[in-house]
Amino acid sequence: MSRVTLSRYLIEQTRSHNTPADLRFLIEVVARACKAISHQVSKGALGGVLGSLDSENVQGEVQKKLDVISNEILLEANEWGGHLAGMASEEMDNAYQIPGKYPKGAYLLVFDPLDGSSNIDVNVSVGTIFSVLRCPDRNGDTGDLGEDAFLQPGTQQVAAGYAIYGPQTMLMLTLGDGVKGFTLDRELGSFVLTHDNIKVPESTKEFAINMSNQRHWEAPVQRYVSELLAGETGPLGRNYNMRWIASMVADVHRILTRGGVFMYPRDAREPDKPGKLRLMYEANPMSMIIEQAGGAATDGSQRILDIQPTSLHQRVPVFLGSKEEVLRVTAYHRG
């Protein structure tokens, strides 16, 4: 039986599900950019790409060399193809305007070019997260694209995915009809379908959270985690294992493939900030993927995909993964 490449899968989606050709081409370009990023990541110290720069991004976070390299790869790969009206990135304060010499398309691309980059110097898996939205009708306006065009709830995503750069490079993708996993065949130079119709187990015995922040959590999270730690003699009646990689892509990938709950709650240290993770290019695409795999994703009080964004770099608390556990911790928040 012949192997199904990403290109073949997307062509078949165009035939059977009327996936627009422009969306197919866009996903293929993003995938090629992810291959280029994977190549840069794999060089490590040999390529002189490790370490930090003297600059900070809009979040006030020190930029790694590979943050900037990955961001440039995605911008340069996607700006000229005619599929996009604009882009936005964790590494840029404002929306990226498609240069006037290139045609503009119907979609918006939002991304975290290198999630988990704080771990890159110690050779931990990192990744790229992306979300695709339709650009609202601009009624003939040819001026710069404003931030408002991007401020759409996650339910409006037409595609979402992430690439994980680990022992293998994988691309996890949803077009709104389930989740597929593709592994990069370096000999072919193509992503090949290796994981079909991925489903998150409804219940689990694993959880991912940064326990060092426990003293700062709100009461519902304190309660839930204490019940997890109580094991089979506690109210949940079973033992749980904790896993924490400190790379959202790596933690969510493990949960997507074998079950679990990922938590990044708000805490008391920065009460004016509702969370650490960004809604538009971290929480929304990951939530779409998890929901399409049968899981759930909330901010503790509501479904993440229903949140109406108010700013491009808006932060939210995140609870996602196996449905049973996400609904339990959400119920604790609701009282």
UniProtKB/Swiss-Prot annotation:
<dbReference type="GO" id="GO:0042132">
    <property type="term" value="F:fructose 1,6-bisphosphate 1-phosphatase activity"/>
</dbReference>
<keyword id="KW-0378">Hydrolase</keyword>
<comment type="subunit">
    <text>Homotetramer.</text>
</comment>
<comment type="similarity">
    <text>Belongs to the FBPase class 1 family.</text>
</comment>
<dbReference type="Pfam" id="PF18913">
    <property type="entry name" value="FBPase_C"/>
</dbReference>
<dbReference type="InterPro" id="IPR044015">
    <property type="entry name" value="FBPase_C_dom"/>
</dbReference>
<feature type="binding site">
    <location>
        <position position="90"/>
    </location>
    <ligand>
        <name>Mg(2+) 1</name>
    </ligand>
</feature>
<feature type="binding site">
    <location>
        <position position="115"/>
    </location>
    <ligand>
        <name>Mg(2+) 2</name>
    </ligand>
</feature>
<keyword id="KW-0479">Metal-binding</keyword>
<feature type="binding site">
    <location>
        <position position="282"/>
    </location>
    <ligand>
        <name>Mg(2+) 2</name>
    </ligand>
</feature>
<dbReference type="InterPro" id="IPR028343">
    <property type="entry name" value="FBPtase"/>
</dbReference>
<dbReference type="Pfam" id="PF00316">
    <property type="entry name" value="FBPase"/>
</dbReference>
<keyword id="KW-0460">Magnesium</keyword>
<feature type="binding site">
    <location>
        <position position="114"/>
    </location>
    <ligand>
        <name>Mg(2+) 1</name>
    </ligand>
</feature>
<comment type="pathway">
    <text>Carbohydrate biosynthesis; gluconeogenesis.</text>
</comment>
<feature type="binding site">
    <location>
        <position position="112"/>
    </location>
    <ligand>
        <name>Mg(2+) 2</name>
    </ligand>
</feature>
<feature type="binding site">
    <location>
        <begin position="115"/>
        <end position="118"/>
    </location>
    <ligand>
        <name>substrate</name>
    </ligand>
</feature>
<dbReference type="GO" id="GO:0005986">
    <property type="term" value="P:sucrose biosynthetic process"/>
</dbReference>
<feature type="binding site">
    <location>
        <position position="112"/>
    </location>
    <ligand>
        <name>Mg(2+) 1</name>
    </ligand>
</feature>
<dbReference type="GO" id="GO:0000287">
    <property type="term" value="F:magnesium ion binding"/>
</dbReference>
<keyword id="KW-0119">Carbohydrate metabolism</keyword>
<dbReference type="GO" id="GO:0030388">
    <property type="term" value="P:fructose 1,6-bisphosphate metabolic process"/>
</dbReference>
<dbReference type="GO" id="GO:0006000">
    <property type="term" value="P:fructose metabolic process"/>
</dbReference>
<protein>
    <recommendedName>
        <fullName>Fructose-1,6-bisphosphatase class 1</fullName>
        <ecNumber>3.1.3.11</ecNumber>
    </recommendedName>
</protein>
<dbReference type="InterPro" id="IPR000146">
    <property type="entry name" value="FBPase_class-1"/>
</dbReference>
<dbReference type="InterPro" id="IPR033391">
    <property type="entry name" value="FBPase_N"/>
</dbReference>
<feature type="binding site">
    <location>
        <position position="210"/>
    </location>
    <ligand>
        <name>substrate</name>
    </ligand>
</feature>
<dbReference type="GO" id="GO:0005829">
    <property type="term" value="C:cytosol"/>
</dbReference>
<dbReference type="GO" id="GO:0006094">
    <property type="term" value="P:gluconeogenesis"/>
</dbReference>
<keyword id="KW-0963">Cytoplasm</keyword>
<dbReference type="GO" id="GO:0006002">
    <property type="term" value="P:fructose 6-phosphate metabolic process"/>
</dbReference>
<feature type="binding site">
    <location>
        <position position="276"/>
    </location>
    <ligand>
        <name>substrate</name>
    </ligand>
</feature>
